[in-house]
Design a protein with these regions (language model features):
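Class I S-adenosyl-L-methionine
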Residues: 15-230
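Compositionally biased, low-complexity flexible segments
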Residues: 1-16
Length: 230
């Protein structure tokens, strides 16, 4: 893997193409399973697929950054099922479709660390200490990285799965706790030195920091032509 490692800043820059006007424009990346008006919306060179477009239907031709829903794969999925939610792993085929898109078009998939989707789809869990390792499917690479290094107020340990792209050296290992800057109603929680994630809303927890988003887009823009995409 050493031959494909690059500095993170170089990876974030990605590849560009020349537009008709002679100006460089970023290579188009399809952002799958993203929020309307969220981090990937209205960006040059990004084709966002929100819930209304149904990213399971994506048929190319661009490399992808995929954020498939994680609720049915997280540690609390069983508890949620006991209270009426769908069964663990029953995500309507979203993860499987995202995995297929990354394998066919190249790119990177993001999920919370310890996601049960890895085992369910035959992928090897990456070491929490960081570093890219083979995913065990003869196709992709996987790693663990904390988004706290990239501006998320929580640590937010994350697993990535990448195919056909350059693999940048990321900020490996534990990230420092970030101070929580919520309203005064949370002052007693700050005084008690509680983790930010414990007082964050769901929307705050799942947001992708701009620096991490740009890193993923930069990786996808290095995607090489995939044999199955012909």
């Amino acid at each position: 893997a050493a031959g494909v490692l690059r500095d993170a800043a170089q990876g974030a820059a990605g590849r560009c193409r020349v537009s008709d006007g002679g100006m460089t424009a970023p290579r188009t990346v399809a952002a799958l399973y993203v929020e309307r008006d969220g981090a990937y919306w209205d960006l040059p060179g990004v084709d966002p697929w929100d819930q209304a477009r149904d990213a399971r239907l994506y048929a190319g031709p661009h490399p992808v950054v995929a954020h498939p829903p994680c609720a049915r794969w997280c540690r609390m999925a069983g508890h949620a099922h006991s209270r009426g939610a769908p069964a663990p792993g029953d995500d309507g085929g979203c993860f499987a479709a995202a995995l297929a898109s990354v394998r066919k078009w190249g790119g990177v998939l993001e999920h919370p660390a310890y996601s049960a989707a890895w085992r369910a789809h035959g992928l090897i869990a990456p070491p929490s200490s960081g570093g890219w390792v083979t995913a065990g499917d003869w196709t992709g690479w996987t790693c663990c990285v904390e988004q706290g290094h990239y501006g998320h107020p929580a640590l937010k340990a994350t697993w990535l799965y990448a195919v056909g792209v350059d693999l940048p050296a990321l900020a490996w290992g534990p990230s420092p706790d970030q101070p929580f800057h919520g309203g005064s109603k949370h002052a007693h929680l700050r005084d008690a030195r509680r983790k930010p994630v414990e007082v964050m809303s769901k929307a705050e927890r799942i947001v992708t920091p701009p620096a991490f988003r740009d890193l993923l887009l930069g990786m996808a823009r290095t995607a090489r032509a995939m044999a199955g995409a012909a």
